[in-house]
Amino acid sequence: MEQLQAVIEDAFERRAEITPRNVEANLKESVAQVINMLDTGKLRVAEKINDEWVTRQWVKKAVLLSFRMEDNYFIKGGFSNYFDKIPSKFADYSSRDFRDGGFRVVPPAAVRKGAFIANNVVLMPSYVNIGAYVDEGTMVDTWATVGSCAQVGKNVHLSGGVGIGGVLEPVQASPTIIEDNCFIGARSEIVEGVIVGENSVISMGVYIGQSTRIYNRETGEVTYGRIPSGSVVVSGSLPADNGRYSLYCAVIVKQVDAKTRSKTGINELLRGI
């Protein structure tokens, strides 16, 4: 793995010179190896180690290099034709491959090669970009988007129209992460490397980026970039210092433990807030 990383790191420093016409065979093979490992889940862009998320920047660099190395080409599809650099994850899948994968794909869902889809995942007509990781038992509902390198945990529900942001550039940024057992309400957007802690519920129409104020109603604390585990979050606003206007924020209205979360329906958690 260290040798693979060294090849990628070296090539990335001279990425502006790389074209589909001059790419070295060794680099092309190395990048293809990384993409294949991402595709099968043997390698992840980010992983939780000792309760902290660690991002492998060199893996993101390999994904970016893949765009430099390939020309767009004609891609046949069941409903249309396409013109892109990256093939569909399922371009060469047989019926047996789908059965072995253990997930459902409802047309016209689209998944790029280099994204991992785990057992018991359901993909409604949705989009999953390269480098993403969608773990077991997750539902990606209609018109939801899982962006490049985003990490989605086990038993997550991404409701209709949800956007989970991708972060390939700037390359030093961490990916957006939705931890296990989270519910993300319809049309909500979680972007820019925000982390949503496990067992959290995000209500419909909540938008959270790195500059979004996250207000804890119980403590009065304002934080950025991370939703604590077990949070129930709705959209709200906070007044300006001069009292003349209010600006958008996300409000943590309550926090529940995993036991309460498992026994309580989503609507019950959001009522009476």
Swiss-Prot record:
EC top class, as a word:
transferase
The EC number on file is 2.3.1.117
Pfam families this protein is in?
Hexapep_2, THDPS_N_2
One GO BP annotation of this record: diaminopimelate biosynthetic process
Q: Which reaction does it catalyse?
A: (S)-2,3,4,5-tetrahydrodipicolinate + succinyl-CoA + H2O = (S)-2-succinylamino-6-oxoheptanedioate + CoA
Where is it located? Cytoplasm
Q: Which CDD domains match?
A: LbH_THP_succinylT
PANTHER family to which the protein is assigned, alphabetical: 2,3,4,5-TETRAHYDROPYRIDINE-2,6-DICARBOXYLATE N-SUCCINYLTRANSFERASE, MOLYBDENUM COFACTOR GUANYLYLTRANSFERASE
Give the UniProt family note: Belongs to the transferase hexapeptide repeat family.
Q: What is this protein called?
A: 2,3,4,5-tetrahydropyridine-2,6-dicarboxylate N-succinyltransferase
According to its UniProt entry, this protein's organism is Nitrosomonas eutropha (strain DSM 101675 / C91 / Nm57)
Taxonomic lineage is: Bacteria, Pseudomonadati, Pseudomonadota, Betaproteobacteria, Nitrosomonadales
